[in-house]
Amino acid sequence: MEISLIGWIHTILGTLAIIVAVFIISTQGFINSKNNFGKFYIIATVITASTALLMYKNGGFNLAHILAILTIVAIILGITSEKYNILGISKYIQAMSYTGSVLFHLIPGIAEVNKRLPIDNPMGLSVLDPVNIRYYLIFTAIIGTTILIQWYFLWKKRSMS
């Protein structure tokens, strides 16, 4: 399967965004827009989600487009929660939104990688292939656990102050 220029931009930025997100979460605990890594993640994520909305090779509007919209909504929610303290839970919303957006990146990425690799015998030929479903569940559990850990540390920090 050949990849278009917009597909390459989408793939490269999306991959870099995921790598940067993992780096941020593992070194700083949370993604935020106040440092350069966080800014890069947010900008790359919005560009990746926006370019996803321009791709229709797989038969029109589909799950990947819905996830792109959810990604943009999550980023907007994360940015908004950084700027405004909503009922004292803005930090929790920020953590959930930004970290959740990583999952929205991963789901279509998993399907695309498994559709293409290995080249001679791809693992998952459709979005709903059992191999892909297993990966979705694994990464949903990892991201969900990460969000719960982030919330725990926010709660602990808040209760100590």
Predicted regions and their residues:
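Alpha-helical membrane insertion/targeting regions
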Residues: 1-161
